[in-house]
Amino acid sequence: VVKLYELSGMQTGSRILTTVAVIAWLPNVMIWAVSWLFGSGFAIGDLASFTMWSGQGSALPGLPAFGILPQAVSTPWIRIALLCIPFVTGLLAGLAVMLFDRGFAVRINKPDQPIDVSRLIAGFAYPAGAFCIASALVAVLSSMLFALSNGALGTKHLAHIGVQVIASTRKVGQPTALGLFSAWLIILVGMAAVFGIRWLIRRVREARGASSEPNTI
């Protein structure tokens, strides 16, 4: 940005006004950054498009505001890590909501306690419903933010700047929902495994007890 100021030969007053304009533009750029960060990207009219795989702004006007736009990420593992952010966030949030006391507090009964089937079903049904609602809210809110961040800087080449709303919403919503329901499935499989192990141990003990009883005639 500073280099663009120097190349454009702006005076102090023009630099201040341009900086204010850049700051006012930051909320939109931050929303575009979410789309870029999760693999969708954004476009500046038909002059340039920016994703983690490619980013070329040489056709853009030499405005300092365009100096804050990102470059492509050349390291593959960094791209993979960034793409996994919504999934990992959803997974950790789902596990926390299901296990913590302030959430649904899903717990396994002690071995000597009887299994309350209705309570067990409710313990998984409520989180499933909550995760469905959360996934829908993420999709709706992200699509609204992406739509509001779009706009125009002109009537020809810069007539449309911003993100593709549907594609960006999908990049945010799908992995987040997948992370939430992966957490639900992990808890379900883990609890089923514990119950299965307990059942096997009980059967082994019963078999040993039956074989150790003396035979009477």
In which residue ranges do the predicted regions lie?
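C-terminal substrate/ligand-recognition segments
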Residues: 83-95, 133-138
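Cytoplasmic membrane-interface segments at the C-terminal ends of transmembrane helices
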Residues: 91-132, 188-213
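Alpha-helical transmembrane segments and their helix-start/interface "positive-inside/aromatic belt" motifs
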Residues: 15-28, 122-136
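Aromatic-anchored segments of alpha-helical transmembrane domains
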Residues: 139-145
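Long, glycine/tryptophan/cysteine-rich extracytoplasmic
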Residues: 2-85, 147-217
